[in-house]
């Protein structure tokens, strides 16, 4: 199995004590993970705690969202400059919950992607379709449109320093998951779309699956040719679940 990325998005969950317990479990078991890079995405208030507790472990830290602006009158926002002080490596860009709940559009996500790379951090660009869009046969047009917005803003070569996560919206937090064949079809299409403008970058690009990944579903999903790991939600709140994935 090729080197993979397994990223745990905690969303708006956990507490100080829960973070300590979760990170302790990951640290105790990370030595058993030889074929994947582990990344955790805590809520902002726990970044300093994660930084301190994960130092020297090889487990990476990411943030769930950022503001594309460096500083200013943006009440409630957190800049990349601030996030970088906590040894952050990755930034989620365009998660479906940001798009759906906060009405963020492709142009905003492209701006965050560009800003993330300007700070020498790695964006994980999240793309995916709703159930309605899938039933209308629009999956690939929606996903490729979300990617094209980034290509237009940053160029295809930018994917040398990025990761993509395909997250079918209908499979997030629902217990549903795309079949390995369905996921592979979209992952292959994503790679092909980027290859049209940046073939070398497309070949080396990590494309994660992010639709209710569990230990039970991970093995078959990760065996697919174009699936390079997972963006894990609920299962990442239990250390052993993430390790087993």
At which residue positions do the language-model features occur?
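Conserved, mostly hydrophobic/aromatic
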Residues: 11, 43, 83, 95, ...
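Conserved N-terminal beta1-alpha1 strand-loop-helix module at the mouth
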Residues: 1-69, 73-78
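Catalytic cores of alpha/beta
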Residues: 213-225
């Amino acid at each position: 199995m090729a080197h993979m990325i397994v990223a745990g998005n905690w969303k708006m969950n956990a507490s100080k004590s829960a973070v300590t317990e979760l990170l302790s479990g990951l640290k105790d078991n990370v030595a058993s993970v030889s074929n994947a890079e582990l990344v955790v995405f805590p809520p902002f208030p726990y970044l300093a705690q994660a930084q301190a507790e994960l130092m020297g472990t090889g487990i990476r830290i990411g943030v769930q969202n950022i503001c594309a602006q460096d500083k200013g009158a943006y009440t409630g926002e957190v800049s990349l400059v601030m996030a970088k002080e906590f040894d952050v490596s990755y930034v989620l860009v365009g998660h479906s919950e940001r798009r759906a709940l906060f009405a963020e559009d492709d142009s905003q996500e492209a701006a965050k992607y560009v800003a993330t790379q300007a700070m020498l951090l790695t964006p994980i660009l999240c793309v995916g379709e709703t159930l309605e869009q899938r039933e209308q046969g629009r999956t690939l047009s929606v996903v490729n449109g979300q990617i094209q917005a980034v290509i237009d803003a940053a160029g295809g070569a930018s994917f040398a320093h990025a990761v993509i996560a395909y997250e079918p919206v209908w499979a997030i937090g629902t217990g549903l998951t795309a079949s390995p064949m369905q996921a592979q079809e979209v992952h292959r299409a994503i790679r092909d779309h980027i290859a049209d403008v940046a073939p070398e970058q497309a070949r080396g690009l990590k494309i994660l699956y992010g639709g209710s990944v569990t230990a039970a579903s991970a093995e078959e999903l990760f065996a697919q040719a174009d699936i390079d790991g997972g963006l894990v939600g609920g299962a990442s709140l239990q250390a052993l679940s993430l390790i087993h994935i």
